[in-house]
């Protein structure tokens, strides 16, 4: 058995070793002072995801202003739409796949996000190919690279949910959660 002072010294030396920082990703929320709309951002292990509420009338205006068939504009109704920005802040290659992401409503039900290929296939049947507006369904990108576009969930305006998402970094899959998100209201909120 080691003498008591040797054990104490060992414990003391262990206490001096650097402890790796425990990673705690923080969700930030901001309210636009002019529109009253909300935006959320979370950076977790170098994967940055930002979601910005978009009013249904704004989304309709974006598609209408491109002289797209009315059926394309109407296809977006009934969807909760966010302006989305994904950025790699990791120092290595990241990739993601929107088809793996889910919105979980307070009743526990999981809702798929509609992906860019699904929208493009639907819009082609309606006489349009306007896929550039939707967040790429998959991406693999280096440090500093980013992707942006609309993300869509078939939920009514004002719906609340948590977003479960995932990404890969150095071949390892990570999962994240953005809690207490809300679809934009049907009408603009009153500015505070």
Regions found by a protein language model. Give the residues of each.
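Conserved functional micro-motifs across diverse proteins
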Residues: 24-192
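N-terminal secretory signal peptides that target proteins for export/translocation
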Residues: 1-7
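Bacterial N-terminal signal peptides
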Residues: 9-19
